[in-house]
Amino acid sequence: MRRLILYADGAARGNPGPAGIGVVIEDERGRVLREVSQFIGRKTNNQAEYMALIQGLEAAAEVQADAILVRLDSELLVHQLKGEYKVKSPLLKPLKNRAQVLLARYKVVGIEHVERQYNRAADRLANRAIDTASADELAESTRDNQQQLSLWDQ
């Protein structure tokens, strides 16, 4: 049985704000098989966390394993994925549902909360995605934020 370990992290500068995701996929011996670093526009931190998980699960599917251990530093996501907390945000419900569909592909699934120090590689990738986003991407993210704020004034 082939097993994978998936570390995922999302970062947002502002909540919502410019956001990025980071993913590290390892085999059971700790060898890095894949890394993902992607700017995802203007999102909340929790949206970014779920999007990192989803992107990680999609990348992991390419490796074709029977078992996966997901390690996240977001207690909220861990509790929601385990069914211990309800998902109240309408922004997060479809993301959680998508993650569950992707997790169902595996015969064995583990979901663990880890301290930030054990998720540093994914965190670095998420922040690097924001840091290296083009000026156009960042401007678009800021413009979206300003448009939404102006809607509140009406």
Q: What do these predicted regions represent?
A:
Residues 1-47, 51, 58-66:
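RNase H-like nuclease fold core
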Residues 1-5, 31-34, 39, 61-64, ...:
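Intrinsically disordered, low-complexity regions
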